[in-house]
């Protein structure tokens, strides 16, 4: 068998083949059981909820909590995980085995195309959507959010605010300790390359700027791994209730490490060192250097207070609430 080609661009599929795979494989697997919109109240828009964060930030644990609430109030949403579309590429299974570092870049172009096609499919049927993305290509996030907005959807966004050292450590921990989030849905367990993490870490800042400056997003929450909220805002009649500060909040929280997070990080580093894997010590030293400045307790002196994420109560009927929701998840009609 010939060796895998090294040029990622050589794996991009012709448009016709890409469309066939979408129709034959992706629609039945990702969208086939959802039908069309179950919303009968003309005052309530379909909703698209984005959970975005760099690789290793903790999206795999945050998104399910949001999905449960969406299911309770509106029924099953389409759940799109951007990375999983790579597995539909015919070259992906071989590349994962023979050239793991090539698997993602070689299949990424088609995966991004399929994600956009899945979103278009959902929009055409008014299906609610929950979408997870690492924002390595922030323009994709912006395009998708704008597409949902232009189609009449309510767009809500949760941005994961996680320090660089913690998300890099999270990548190593989930892989070497074989945690479930190492392989989202039908993805095999994977060790995300450092450059991919760096790209998504930077891309998230661009996504935050888009949220602040675009009219496409109706509600935003900046949240940490433990569902602690640092910033929340909502548009009313096209304008933010508060000064737009998504990017500012994201940057502030990235420079802040909570005591519980540090305690867990120290234990994770100790456990990984105990595995005696030759390539780990240099990476752990880098991570410790990233976390070092955050271990100073004085860093948190002037940080804004955090509070728990507020979502609609599961099982509570109706659209009126006595508290301000960080994400309404489309449960509140526009005229209320």
Describe each PLM feature range.
Residues 49-50:
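Short hydrophobic/aromatic beta-strand immediately N-terminal to the Walker A/P-loop
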Residues 1-44, 205-336:
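C-terminal accessory extensions appended to soluble enzyme cores
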Residues 87-90, 164-170, 229-232:
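Switch/connector loops and helix/strand junctions flanking conserved nucleotide-binding motifs
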Residues 59:
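Conserved lysine of the Walker
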Residues 72-149:
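Conserved nucleotide-sensing/catalytic segment adjacent to the nucleotide-binding pocket
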Residues 62, 66:
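Hydrophobic positions on the alpha1 helix immediately C-terminal to the Walker A/P-loop
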Residues 54-55:
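The conserved Walker
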């Amino acid at each position: 068998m010939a060796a895998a080609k090294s040029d990622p661009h050589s794996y991009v599929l012709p448009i016709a083949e890409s469309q066939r795979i979408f129709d034959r494989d992706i629609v039945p697997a990702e969208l086939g059981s959802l039908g069309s919109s179950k919303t009968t109240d003309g005052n309530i828009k379909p909703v698209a909820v984005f959970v975005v964060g760099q690789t290793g930030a903790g999206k795999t644990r945050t998104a399910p909590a949001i999905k449960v609430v969406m299911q309770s109030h509106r029924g099953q949403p389409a759940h799109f995980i951007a990375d999983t579309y790579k597995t539909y590429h015919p070259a992906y299974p071989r590349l994962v085995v023979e050239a793991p570092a090539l698997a993602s870049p070689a299949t990424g172009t088609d995966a991004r195309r399929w994600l956009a096609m899945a979103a278009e499919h959902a929009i055409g049927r008014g299906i609610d959507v929950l979408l997870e993305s690492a924002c390595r290509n922030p323009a994709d996030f912006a395009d998708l959010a704008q597409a949902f907005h232009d189609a009449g959807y309510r767009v809500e966004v949760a941005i994961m605010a996680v320090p660089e050292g913690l998300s890099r450590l999270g990548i190593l921990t989930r892989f070497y300790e074989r945690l479930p989030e190492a392989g989202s849905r039908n993805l095999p367990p994977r060790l995300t390359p450092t450059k991919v993490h760096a790209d998504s870490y930077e891309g998230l800042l661009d996504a935050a700027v888009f949220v602040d400056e675009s009219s496409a997003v109706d509600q935003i929450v900046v949240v940490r791994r433990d569902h602690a909220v640092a910033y929340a805002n909502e548009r009313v009649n096209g304008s933010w209730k508060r000064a737009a500060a998504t990017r500012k909040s994201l940057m502030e929280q990235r420079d802040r490490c909570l005591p519980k997070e540090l305690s867990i990080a120290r234990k994770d580093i100790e456990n990984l060192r105990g595995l005696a894997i030759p390539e780990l010590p240099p990476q752990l030293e880098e991570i410790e250097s990233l976390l070092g400045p955050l271990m100073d307790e004085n860093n948190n002196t002037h940080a804004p207070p955090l509070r728990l994420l507020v979502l609609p109560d599961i099982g509570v009927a109706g659209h009126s609430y006595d508290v301000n929701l960080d994400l309404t998840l489309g449960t509140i009609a526009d005229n209320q």
